[in-house]
A protein has these predicted regions:
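ATP-binding glycine-rich loop module of kinase domains
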Residues: 43-65
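Structural motif in protein kinase domains
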Residues: 99-108
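Short beta-strand micro-motifs within the conserved protein kinase catalytic domain, predominantly
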Residues: 81-92
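Structural motif at the C-terminus of the N-lobe alphaC helix and the adjacent alphaC-beta4 loop
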Residues: 69-77
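Conserved N-lobe ATP-binding subsite of Hanks-type protein kinase domains
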Residues: 37
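Activation segment/activation loop of eukaryotic-type protein kinase catalytic domains
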Residues: 151-187
């Protein structure tokens, strides 16, 4: 579809639905996926900037409805707040506060070169985010740089988004863990997906953590070895990438990186299917790595945060430092 046609579709939606739930005005499309689109807009009652996520009501799997349920269950720092959820004749609609750039967009804007302290701070926060998600008995299943956004008004906070593919790994009532299976459809993104997910095995907490590892290595090196794999057939692509990920040793994958990255990958790759990860150990790897480089947690901030415009004590309270 050419750019002109896309713009027409964009403007047609906004013309057709100029006001959502009598107070949210969509202004422009900011993202789109296989099943959903996201529009930036405002709450006309208070001028709050919002993100309006829509999904066709006639699809079989209600990803947006599932995402809304998950977000309600996960309410906490670094998780998008649900402002409104409902539907019209055509769409299910989820309204959330508008967030800032993704970690991928920020990385690209910095010429694919984050400062070292930024990567350590990113690691600490995203491990905390996934620990919280797991503590609520959910797994995310699509960890990637695109799904972590900084706050619009609180750029010191990283938000984990897009819970449409998340699922419960443990029953809240019985406490029973989901069963291991080797006959699942692949869920996630090939570049960051775990070896087990690419082999169509049931995912658990270890898989989210493995994906985080690949993401951090990508930020350190600017590229992952399997990103050069190019095949037309998806199944062949899954097979090739999973073989590369399985065969490459952590020491080789993390070559020329601080040993903490190797330690991280060794730990998460050795986790059992139902094992409860030691998040404190993983988080502390990067706290100690920062200290080695002369940075103290709580006294340094992301390079994109203008500390002259923010209240440091308020940040520390928010981050529980």
């Amino acid at each position: 579809m050419d750019k002109h046609k896309k713009e027409n579709l964009n403007s047609n939606f906004i013309k057709k639905y100029p006001l959502i739930f009598k107070k949210y005005r969509p202004i422009r499309k900011i993202a789109s996926g296989v099943f959903s689109e996201i529009y930036g807009g405002i709450n006309i009652l208070n001028n709050e900037k919002v993100a309006i996520k829509i999904e066709k009501r006639n699809i079989k799997n209600k990803y947006l409805e599932s995402e809304c349920y998950t977000l309600f269950s996960l309410r906490n720092i670094g998780i998008p707040q649900v402002l409104s959820f409902g539907h019209n004749k055509e769409y299910d609609i989820l309204v959330m506060p508008l967030l800032g750039k993704s970690l991928l967009d920020l990385f690209i804007s910095k010429n694919s070169n984050y400062e070292f302290k930024d990567i350590c701070l990113i690691a600490i926060q995203i491990i905390e985010r996934i620990q919280w998600v797991h503590s609520r008995k959910f797994i995310h299943r699509d960890i990637k740089p695109d799904n972590f956004l900084i706050g619009l008004n609180d750029p010191h906070i990283i938000y984990l988004i897009d819970f449409g593919l998340s699922k419960k790994y443990q029953s809240t009532k019985s406490g029973k863990h989901i069963l291991y299976s080797e006959s699942k459809k692949f869920t996630g993104t090939i570049t960051y997906g775990s070896v087990n997910s690419l082999k169509c095995r049931e995912q658990s907490r270890r898989d989210d953590l493995e994906s985080i590892g690949y993401m951090l290595i990508y930020f350190m090196k600017g590229r992952l070895p399997w990103q050069s794999v190019k095949v037309d057939n998806k199944k062949e692509s899954y097979l090739r990438v999973s073989q590369m990920k399985k065969s490459i040793l952590p020491e080789e994958l993390c070559e020329n990186l601080p040993g903490e990255f190797t330690d991280y990958m060794k730990y998460v790759k050795n986790l059992k299917f139902e094992e409860n990860p030691n998040y404190g150990y993983l988080r502390n790897l990067f706290v100690q790595l920062m200290k080695k480089q002369g940075f103290e947690e709580g006294t340094c901030f992301f390079s994109w945060v203008n500390i002259n415009n923010i209240n440091i004590n308020n940040i520390k309270r928010q981050m529980k430092i």
